[in-house]
Amino acid sequence: MENLYTSKEEKTKITFTAIDNKNLNDITEPGFYVSASWDNNFSNLPSEIDKPSSKAFYLVVFSVGGGTYCQQIIYSFKGLIYYRAVVGFGNNFTQWRKINLS
């Protein structure tokens, strides 16, 4: 029974790819990403976290069609959540939208 549990546990783990010094417009590959340092360097962050000591976050990317349809969700280590998307071929990302949970 223990081996079965371990096998199941391995299938449910999420692997995060560490990122730094990136343009978020270029991250269109589906996956889970992490910026683990407050002072990492990025472009195209939401303005509220594009400040010194605010750039630690998780990024989740959903994408199909080689980025033709792409969604990015940022979960800031400061408790802020943002969303944006590309909604068709040749289009740019929409502006970041803050998600309020309260």
What label would you give each PLM region?
Residues 1, 100-102:
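Short intrinsically disordered terminal tails
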Residues 2-79, 87-91:
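Glycine-rich, flexible loop motifs
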